[in-house]
């Protein structure tokens, strides 16, 4: 029996009738306490339970060493409250944020909903965060950095779209010495107009501004939506080449509501009319399609962080085989619990030696047991 999946999750999702955001905040506060107190006995127990180390899983990318290819996606630990604890839960990297130049409360509550019938979540958070300065201060206090830390950058809600570049630049300047890689988030559906910044004519000045400041010192990526069509992705790939992006994160949440079993949300009404993005299992297939398209269109030359609907080893393998170099989990981790990461890693390590007759089935990130090296 899986204690989390069979006992704790049903209580959290239904038995306690708890607001999902309240539960998440409570977990983050507990992990923040662990980080602050460095309760070594508890941290050691977490490491024994959830860390799986195997040098065959190491990924070297952008001059960074990732102990394994499974990371925590942006949005869970926006303010880096537990950034020192995620390594003890087995993650190979963590992406904090989305962060904006100044603090902002986000959209009105309730704004996070679990959809258990669909193994999914609906969120309409709106970049709630304490601001770049607060995150910078927290990252400066880190005692050690055993895994790479990515920082996801966003535009403030009150900032006009035509001034978006200034917002991304302001946060980058505050945080550039503290992040190992940076992600430009122009794909969240929860800030009015933000997704329009994925259009080439809108995205180009943002990338020009950031890369002009960056001068190639930090890996810069863009996170894209799953709802883009192929010509729109092609335009972003042209910008990726023109502005020497280090990679893409594929994908953010989706606005699509088709094929969902959930129809109504208590206190909110019809799901079809609810604002926000869907994450989890319904996103798996489309995010993998986008990963495969990018990988093929760039002949495997543009690294991809694959995210969306990873619940099982098969899900993870699918994205690696499609062309992802690294993976991120969020909703799957909420549903499956902390045992998900070591379970995935054990499976990936076992999969590194396939039958000689089927080398094409090897995950891209661990082909033939070799470590990936993709430094520009």
UniProtKB/Swiss-Prot annotation:
Pathway: Pyrimidine metabolism; UMP biosynthesis via de novo pathway; orotate from (S)-dihydroorotate (quinone route): step 1/1. Binds 1 FMN per subunit. Substrate binds at residues 78, 123-127, 185, 190, 252-253. Its EC number is 1.3.5.2. It comes from the Bacteria. It catalyses: (S)-dihydroorotate + a quinone = orotate + a quinol. GO terms for molecular function: dihydroorotate dehydrogenase (quinone) activity. Its main location: membrane. GO terms for cellular component: cytoplasm; plasma membrane. InterPro entries: Aldolase_TIM, DHO_dehydrogenase, Dihydroorotate_DH_2, Dihydroorotate_DH_cat, Dihydroorotate_DH_CS. FMN binds at residues 74-78, 98, 152, 185, 223, 251, 280, 309, 330-331. Residues 352-376 are annotated as: Disordered. GO terms for biological process: 'de novo' pyrimidine nucleobase biosynthetic process; 'de novo' UMP biosynthetic process. Belongs to the dihydroorotate dehydrogenase family. Type 2 subfamily. NCBIfam families: PRK05286.2-4, PRK05286.2-5, pyrD_sub2. Monomer. HAMAP family: DHO_dh_type2. This is Dihydroorotate dehydrogenase (quinone).
